[in-house]
């Protein structure tokens, strides 16, 4: 789509009453020019234009342009500070940039605004584990597991955190639970859990009886 056509599309959308749909969904496709045209179109203001920044930020995040994504999410949060998904999206960009403290703070904010979804707890657990805070990571994973008990990846990641703490029995229980969940689109997760179980079995010391004196 040409840069001339994009603004024309936005104007046409306004004319036929599709402006809100265009703004809210401009990030669904890899067309950042549409989001940029929405941002530059003066009738859009306030929380509505935040969707355009959010959409362009998500496009940048999908393509690994984390700094661009963070800049757009900053603008979106400034315009719509009570939208939990914006903090979660920015947290993902921070985490991928290695800014774990900022990522954890944003996951905390996303959870404070909307504590029901499991994913922010899971992703916060990943950031905490990467930072070495295994106790808090396990707590965060545990909430994710409670909210989404069929999420095999959350159980695998909690098992890995238990394993890193030397809690082999707890780790084994999570790996076994991940494998036992109903089949879905998580074959790689199950394979990883099986591999970890095999490692644990191989690492178990052979029980040798010592004769009593």
Regions found by a protein language model. Name each.
Residues 54, 61, 88, 94-95, ...:
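Position-specific recognition of the canonical hydrophobic site in helix A of tetratricopeptide repeat
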Residues 55, 89, 123, 157, ...:
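Canonical tetratricopeptide repeat
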């Amino acid at each position: 789509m040409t840069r001339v056509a994009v603004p024309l599309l936005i104007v046409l959308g306004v004319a036929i009453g599709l402006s809100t749909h265009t703004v809210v969904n401009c990030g669904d496709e890899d067309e950042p020019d549409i989001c940029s045209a929405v941002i530059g179109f003066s009738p859009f203001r306030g929380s509505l234009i935040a969707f355009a920044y959010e959409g362009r930020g998500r496009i940048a995040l999908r393509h690994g342009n984390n700094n661009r994504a963070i800049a757009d999410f900053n603008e979106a949060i400034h315009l719509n500070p009570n939208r939990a998904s914006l903090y979660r999206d920015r947290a993902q960009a921070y985490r991928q940039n290695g800014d774990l403290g900022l990522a954890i703070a944003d996951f905390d904010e996303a959870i404070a605004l909307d504590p029901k979804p499991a994913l922010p707890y899971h992703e916060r657990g990943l950031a905490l584990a990467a930072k070495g805070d295994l106790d808090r990571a396990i707590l965060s994973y545990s909430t994710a597991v409670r909210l989404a008990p069929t999420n095999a990846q959350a159980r695998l990641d909690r098992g890995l955190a238990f394993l890193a703490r030397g809690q082999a029995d707890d780790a084994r229980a999570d790996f076994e639970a991940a494998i036992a969940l109903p089949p879905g689109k998580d074959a790689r997760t199950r394979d990883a859990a099986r591999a970890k179980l095999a490692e644990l079995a191989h690492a178990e010391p052979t029980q040798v009886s010592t004769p009593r004196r």
